[in-house]
Amino acid sequence: IIASGFLPEGVMARALITLTEGKSAALQDLGIADVNNGLPATGTCTDGITLICDPEGKKYTDAGSFSLLGSLLSKAAYESVRDCIETYDHPWNASSLLRTPPAQGIDRLRKLSEKS
């Protein structure tokens, strides 16, 4: 992600969280499940985020999901992940074993928490 403004360290950290939330939302909406426990996935072993900002640009003070910058970052992450998975649908994410409806994932999470 390339931001045309300056993000101080705290804002950059929040931007990374907001980007991760957008990515996770896309994975959940697509029904991608964690291969180890069947719960809705929040990432993959191959994903990562690079955030580049302009130290000479406009200074941003917030990148949370309710700020304009955060909303744009979240939307960019969501659409990028969704488009990539829909365009490059490979066997690893096409298997019915890797897809789970959200309710099933919640039930599995409850069962796992009851075992602890």
Name the predicted role of every residue range.
Residues 1-116:
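A structural signal for small-residue-enriched, beta-sheet-centric alpha/beta enzyme cores
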